[in-house]
Design a protein with these regions (language model features):
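Jelly-roll (double-stranded beta-helix
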Residues: 1-210
Length: 210
């Protein structure tokens, strides 16, 4: 079986930043911080810190205009992997933030004593510690949190703006320029089955990890 999970997580931008220059960065798996917590029964939970500090673990630097880079955004993306029988407490978020626990692997997770269904998203109280327990098997979950922008959202296909007029303009821009110019001859270029890991940045710099 294919045990690969892919998540496409979108962070909205404030209206003032909707038209900033695009930016790309790569978070290599070996560079992403991980925190390990062992409970009283000897079970170790691993928290992968993709965004938002956890204990003393600081995440990698997000793109400069990302909402995650703004002071006070309270953005966190944590991947929590727990073996059967493990217990772990997560620190509170801000009182104005939204926090969701997405259980995507396993079905024996308790949140503060309440059993939640597998493959489900669960909104939790943000500003108190969160106690997670893997009661009947190993589980994996995403913790997603952040302070809402409190701005209108207009969305159509892959376009997310603040007003319908901005959506129409974004579609026109795409039709005219293909996201600023598509340099490849096909819509689905690839690098072949033998190409190792690499990242090509807008300034021409290439990172290779093999």
């Amino acid at each position: 079986p294919n045990d690969l999970h892919l998540f496409q997580i979108w962070l909205n931008l404030p209206s003032s930043d909707k038209l900033v220059d695009p930016y790309f960065t790569m978070f290599w798996t070996e560079d992403i911080p991980r925190v390990r917590r062992t409970d009283a029964d000897g079970h170790t939970t691993e928290i992968t810190v993709i965004a938002g500090a956890f204990d003393d673990a600081e995440p990698l630097t997000p793109p400069p205009d990302s909402w995650a880079a703004k002071p006070g955004s309270d953005v966190a993306i944590w991947h929590v992997a727990m073996p059967a029988g493990a217990h772990v407490e997560l620190p509170p978020a801000g009182s104005e933030s939204a926090r969701v626990v997405y259980l995507f692997e396993g079905d024996g997770l308790e949140i503060d004593g309440h059993v939640i269904a597998g493959n489900s998203g669960n909104v939790v109280v943000p500003d108190r510690e969160l106690e997670l327990s893997a009661t009947s098997g190993s589980v994996e979950a995403l913790i997603l949190q952040g302070r809402p922008l409190a701005e209108p959202v207009a969305q159509y296909g892959p376009f997310v703006m603040t007003t319908e007029a901005e959506i129409r303009q974004a579609i026109l821009d795409y039709q005219e320029t293909g996201f600023g110019g598509w340099p490849w001859e096909t819509d689905d270029p690839h690098h072949g089955p033998t190409q190792g890991r690499f990242a090509r940045h807008a300034d021409g710099r290439v990172e290779e990890k093999g």
